[in-house]
Amino acid sequence: MEKFTVVNSVAAPLKIINVDTDMIIPKQYLKTIKRTGLGKGLFSEQRYKEDGSENPDFVLNKPAYRNAQILVAGDNFGCGSSREHAPWALADFGIRCVISTSFGDIFYNNSFKNGLLPIRVTHEQLDKLFEDAERGANATLTIDLEKQEIRGPDGGVINFEIDPFRKHCLLNGLDDIGLTMQKKPSIDSFEAREKVARPWL
């Protein structure tokens, strides 16, 4: 998993509340268990017209936001069914951080496991971030995980909370497999002892 330390990027404003996981990645893209390639399906029903061409009015299709690594979204982002494909699709598209006032619980937990940082802010802070994001290429946000800060284009700072363990995992690029591999010497030692103590196993 890629480490998350500091991200400096324009932020795409998605002023929609209750964005559910089916909107993030529709069901037809759930046949795969690969984490790569899902970026093309991200918000596909909003990004594309019926003929398959791009919808120029959707925020992620606008030139200023095509390479955005930060998404500023309305309340209750990631609600709905529990599909890990949602953070996979966001990450594959290039999104590293989603900022909202609230998140669906399962999406919130899955995000950390896949290198995606979900940040909760107040409604007042979200309104300010939407204002910054709508300036497009003329304004970038900086997400500093170590300092737990969102720095705006005009020097303003918003502090955010994060569980210390989740922060450690993101800073060090540790997913569940990475955490297990940290314990490999202890696991190997245990298995060696068990082979001697219980050779029939």
Swiss-Prot record:
EC number: 4.2.1.33
Gene Ontology biological-process entries: L-leucine biosynthetic process
Annotated catalysed reactions: (2R,3S)-3-isopropylmalate = (2S)-2-isopropylmalate
Gene3D superfamilies hit by this protein: Aconitase, domain 4 (3.20.19.10)
SUPFAM superfamilies: LeuD/IlvD-like
Keyword entries, A-Z: Amino-acid biosynthesis, Branched-chain amino acid biosynthesis, Leucine biosynthesis, Lyase
Keyword Amino-acid biosynthesis included in the entry's annotation: yes
Domain of life of the native organism: Bacteria
Pathway: Amino-acid biosynthesis; L-leucine biosynthesis; L-leucine from 3-methyl-2-oxobutanoate: step 2/4
Entry's Gene Ontology cellular component terms: 3-isopropylmalate dehydratase complex
Principal EC category: lyase
Database matches in Pfam families: Aconitase_C
InterPro entries associated with the record: 3-IsopropMal_deHydase_ssu, Aconitase/3IPM_dehydase_swvl, AconitaseA/IPMdHydase_ssu_swvl, IPMI_Swivel, LeuD
UniProt keyword annotation of Iron present: no
An MF annotation (GO) of this entry: 3-isopropylmalate dehydratase activity
Oligomer status and interactors: Heterodimer of LeuC and LeuD.
Role description: Catalyzes the isomerization between 2-isopropylmalate and 3-isopropylmalate, via the formation of 2-isopropylmaleate.
PANTHER family per the UniProt record, alphabetical: 3-ISOPROPYLMALATE DEHYDRATASE SMALL SUBUNIT, 3-ISOPROPYLMALATE DEHYDRATASE SMALL SUBUNIT 2-RELATED-RELATED
Family: Belongs to the LeuD family. LeuD type 1 subfamily.
Record's protein name: 3-isopropylmalate dehydratase small subunit
Organism ancestry: Bacteria, Pseudomonadati, Pseudomonadota, Alphaproteobacteria, Hyphomicrobiales
Gene transcribed to yield this protein: leuD
